[in-house]
């Protein structure tokens, strides 16, 4: 597993000012996001947890997975959650030519339309940003759970979420994927409870 920032350093949004790194509302809130789904069983479990706590979230969906599991995608939408484009084939922008990357984004737009996009791995070139910024709102994050990291425990995943005090308008990332499942399903309800107990609400981006 390569090096990654659990919390976004202050200078990174300065390099990519056209991207969304946090929410922008007055109340004490957190934006909860999930990447890489939908998955026929894992996403369903996530929806059950969110329903239990009456929380809404963003799901950044891989177009190919939406084609495979359309009913699961429909269930996300039916439950009042927001969906976003996560490319059709989960492309790494740093390893993909801009023309191919944009075409992959557009292929997902043919499957479902969304106002929001998150680049897989958070890796996108300046050229790709320039090509896409008029087509979508690009959403990054302020805090990673690290649930995708095979080298950490589920307890460490939870610690990543709550060790440093939460700040209003933060965007946090989990994954509704097989690789992340064990850590995500352990940490998610505990993180939600922690946030609610500390006076935060969960909001959707506008």
Question: Where are the regions a protein language model picked out?
Answer:
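Catalytic grooves of carbohydrate-active enzymes
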Residues: 162-206
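Charged helix-capping and loop-helix junction motifs
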Residues: 71-74, 98-105, 153-159, 185-189
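Active-site groove signature of glycoside hydrolases
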Residues: 29-36, 171-177
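Acidic-and-aromatic substrate-binding clefts and catalytic sites of carbohydrate-active enzymes
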Residues: 37-41, 60-69, 91-99, 118-125, ...
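His/Asp/Glu-enriched short active-site or ligand-binding loop at hydrolase and phosphoryl-transfer sites
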Residues: 123, 129-165, 199-206
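N-terminal pre-catalytic segment of deacetylase/amide-hydrolase enzymes
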Residues: 1-32, 38-52, 68-71, 189-206
